[in-house]
């Protein structure tokens, strides 16, 4: 079976090895919880959930074939308008983590995505993050409409909020 190929925003091709895996959820981050990530209760401190989800968030556009450089060249970017983290179960030092992401909604100027953090060795759900990002004109310092070509790359990846 041939490897799926998707066009990036800049026109080049990227091979996608897991495009349809896990109901369109895809891995955005992998790591390990270190002792320095833990608080006085022995589990990962909330500040690091935000850090790891943020790192994973940059992979969302990359997965759609959109590079940070291509946005910069057009004078647009994305800024976070809202972020919410729900803590489900502890994750402790020495545990491997895996974060998966999915696009949930797309609007005229914004998009929403969700990421889920799992303890990788047993697939225990540890936290979820929902985030809304707004397209931003970096010169005008104001929100901007989502370009049609970017919409065309993201829209097929949206799975909706009711899908698991």
Question: For the regions a protein language model found, what residue spans apply to each?
Answer:
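Beta-strand/loop substructures that line and gate deep hydrophobic ligand-binding cavities in soluble
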Residues: 124-130
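Solvent-exposed strand-loop boundary residues in beta-sheet-rich modules
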Residues: 121-123, 139
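Short, low-complexity intrinsically disordered segments enriched in A/P/G/S/L with frequent Arg
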Residues: 2-8
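Hydrophobic beta-strand-centered segment that forms part of the acyl-chain substrate-binding groove
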Residues: 60-111, 126
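PAS-family sensory domains and close relatives that share small-molecule sensor folds
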Residues: 105, 119, 134-135
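Hydrophobic/aromatic beta-strand elements that line small-molecule binding cavities or substrate pockets
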Residues: 85-87, 114-117, 131-133
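Hot-dog-fold acyl-thioester-processing enzymes
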Residues: 9-80, 137-164
């Amino acid at each position: 079976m041939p490897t799926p190929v998707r066009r990036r925003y800049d026109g080049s091709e990227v091979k996608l090895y897991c495009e349809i895996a896990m109901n369109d959820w895809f891995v955005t981050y992998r790591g390990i919880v270190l002792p320095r990530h833990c608080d006085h209760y022995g589990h990962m401190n909330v500040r690091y959930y935000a850090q790891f989800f943020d790192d994973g968030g940059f992979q969302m556009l990359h997965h759609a074939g959109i590079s940070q450089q291509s946005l910069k060249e057009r004078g647009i970017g994305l800024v976070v308008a809202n972020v919410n983290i729900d803590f489900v179960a502890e994750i402790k030092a020495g545990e491997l983590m895996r974060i998966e992401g999915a696009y949930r909604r797309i609007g005229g100027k914004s998009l929403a995505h969700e990421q889920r953090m799992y303890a990788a060795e047993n697939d225990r759900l540890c936290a979820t993050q929902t985030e809304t990002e707004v397209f931003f004109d970096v010169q005008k310092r104001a929100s901007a409409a989502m370009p049609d070509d970017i919409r065309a790359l993201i829209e097929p990846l949206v799975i909706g909020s009711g899908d698991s």
